[in-house]
Amino acid sequence: AASDVYKRQGDKLVEEAKKQAAEILDRLNPKAVIAVERPGWNDKHVHHSGMGYDISSVTAKLDYLYEEARARGILTIGVGDLGNEMGMGNVEEEVKAGIPNGATCLCGCGGGIATSVKSDVGLICNISNWGAYGICACLAALAGEEEVLHSGEMEKRMIRACVDAGALDPVSGMLIPRVDGEPEEINAYII
């Protein structure tokens, strides 16, 4: 499994990740740490794609940053649409019970895709981007700066730029302007 490389490097990588997490939080002193569509490890510390593949070797260990933020009392918000995202550990058992590959996976670790990384606030939505846009809209409204929000037309341009750069729609597996199966027009409308 891809996570075998990580396990072989083990303690050295773990300590470095923890050290960097502390340094980042010390330097930035954030009021909140928000994870959007960010894979979180399961109870075996393996990161999975939604399909159940081990993606640990290509996933930065931001779980340590998130856990350190929680330990310091910094607000953590997790935005997800499946249950493998950081911060969705609040509904880990529900994900294991109700989501394909929630309790099992294709890599053989035996932990499933359900993340064990919890958050203070979990925002579950049909598409993670939409949840993030909702947070941005609330913050912009509170600050009285709605003009900082992007338009539906900008959303379409961003989606097309992603496709032009090679991003696949994960539902169809095709190079088409969709986000999690939803056409660009629907995504623009949400904005």
Which ranges hold each PLM region?
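Catalytic cores of nucleophile-dependent amide-cleaving enzymes
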Residues: 63-95
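Short glycine-rich anion-binding loops that position phosphate/pyrophosphate groups of nucleotides
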Residues: 38-41, 82
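Proline-aspartate-enriched helix->loop->beta-strand connector
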Residues: 30-31
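C-terminal functional extensions of proteins
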Residues: 85-191
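A short, gly/pro- and small-residue-rich
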Residues: 43-72
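Short, small-residue-biased leader/transition segments that mark boundaries at the very start
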Residues: 1-6
